[in-house]
Design a protein with these regions (language model features):
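Binuclear metal-dependent hydrolase catalytic cores centered on His/Asp/Glu-rich metal-binding motifs
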Residues: 163-197, 203, 208-265, 365-368
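Conserved beta-sheet core of the metallophosphoesterase superfamily
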Residues: 259-376
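Active-site neighborhood of phospho(di)ester-bond hydrolases with catalytic His/Asp-centered motifs
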Residues: 91-93, 119-125, 148-154, 200-202, ...
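Short, conserved loop/helix-junction motifs that constitute active-site signature segments
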Residues: 114-115, 140-145, 244-248, 267-270
Length: 387
């Protein structure tokens, strides 16, 4: 009897654990170097989990750096380099807020307490259903004292629907077309833009962002050229555009929701320094020691989450843009290079991408396994051109 009870308790714990893990958010930090004249970024040190945020469900607080996984195998920092500027980007994605995720509203709002954040990037799928609008306002208002930019995912237009989990392992032969949005997209967009954040859904912008005085550096403004696409997963992405300031900006940043190869190739072709994306949930349900089983894009599973270098042509046959049954031809990458002012095509073949593991889940599958919810702070250190 005692053995049977122990086995029953073990089975119950195994079933309950993925629900528990889905409500244990963590903050991951990345340190990346921007070298003048070089596309993409280099890791400065291993990423680590920051345990300094309070646990909103238990009041506990940790203070250690905890290095994890393959992302620990990165380039060692050259401590002799003295960056000319530095900005810290808070990357949030896939909140999927609804009335049952009040805990996540509190967590996101608490991130505003990190005064070293200089910029906020929001990469889509903010809703699960329409009840999330007021929660999003409460979650993001404390962060809107900072400059920011956003793009949308499908769950900023259409509410989440129940899908059998095995659905993601097999391509849809006849995908369902949802033509009429049922979420308060216009109201949410107005909330974000009225707070001064840049709408990058198939749009561009240029911002002057302050690199604060830190570690002996003086404060200075840097020019950040911004580009973005609407959600590639549902074919709302148009050909990438870049602002006129792209070639001369201190930093070139791109946002998209779903990291499809056709979009990453375009940003590699125009020498973006960093692309921020979400959508994959890091795989959401992963095998310990193996990783993601599916990422719902055309990328290899190794690109399901984290920071990666992306080479143009990594995927041989990128999925085409399909919108409401229409298949669009590939974008002319040479024309894009010309628009971006990239004269050396051999240099414009790579970029760096951060694929967020996301903070939320659908209310229909509120579980995670070996893939906790994450927010990320990405520190970009720009090296001086006279080094």
């Amino acid at each position: 009897m005692r053995k049977r009870s122990a086995l029953g308790a073990l089975a119950l714990s195994a079933v309950a654990y993925p629900f528990w893990e889905a409500r244990r958010p963590r903050l991951r930090r990345y340190q990346l170097l921007k070298a003048p004249g070089m596309p993409g970024l280099k890791p400065e040190e291993a990423s680590y989990i920051d345990g300094n945020l309070p646990d909103l469900r238990g009041g506990c607080c940790q203070s250690q750096r905890r290095y994890t996984g393959k992302e620990s195998a990165t380039i060692a920092v050259n401590r002799q380099q003295n960056p000319a500027w530095q900005i810290r980007i808070l990357h949030l994605s896939d909140l999927h807020l609804w009335s049952g995720s009040e805990w996540l509203t509190e967590y996101v709002a608490s991130l505003a307490e990190f005064t070293e954040i200089d910029f906020v990037a929001l990469t889509g799928d903010n809703f699960c259903d329409a009840s999330g609008l007021e929660m999003l306002r409460r979650a993001l208002t404390p962060l809107m004292k900072l400059p920011g930019a956003f793009v949308f995912g499908s769950n900023d237009y259409y509410s989440g629907q129940f899908k059998v989990p095995l659905h993601y392992f097999f391509p849809e032969k006849k995908p369902k077309l949802r033509r009429v949005p049922d979420l308060p997209t216009a109201e949410f967009r107005e909330f974000l833009t009225s707070g001064g954040w840049s709408d990058l859904n198939n749009q561009v912008d240029t911002l002057a962002i302050t690199s604060p005085a830190r570690q002996g550096r003086s404060a200075r403004e840097i020019s950040v050229a911004l580009s973005g696409t609407d959600d590639p997963h549902i074919g709302r992405d148009e050909a990438v555009q870049v602002p006129d300031t792209w070639g001369k900006a201190d930093f070139r940043l791109a946002l998209t929701h779903a990291p499809y190869a056709r979009v990453l190739d375009q940003y590699a072709a125009c020498a973006a320094d960093l692309v921020l994306a979400g959508h994959t949930h890091g795989g959401q349900v992963c095998l310990p020691g193996f990783g993601a089983l599916v990422n719902n894009t055309d990328l290899p599973l190794s690109y399901s989450g984290g920071v990666h270098s992306w080479q143009l042509g990594t995927v041989d046959n990128p999925a085409p843009r399909v919108r409401l049954g229409k298949i669009y031809p590939p974008v002319d990458l040479q024309a894009l290079r010309n628009q971006a002012g990239i004269s050396n095509p051999t240099a414009a073949r790579q970029t760096t991408v951060h694929i967020a593991r996301g903070l939320g889940t659908s209310k229909f599958t509120p579980v995670r396994l070996a893939c906790p919810p994450e927010a990320a702070i990405i520190t970009i250190s720009g090296l001086s051109s006279d080094k």
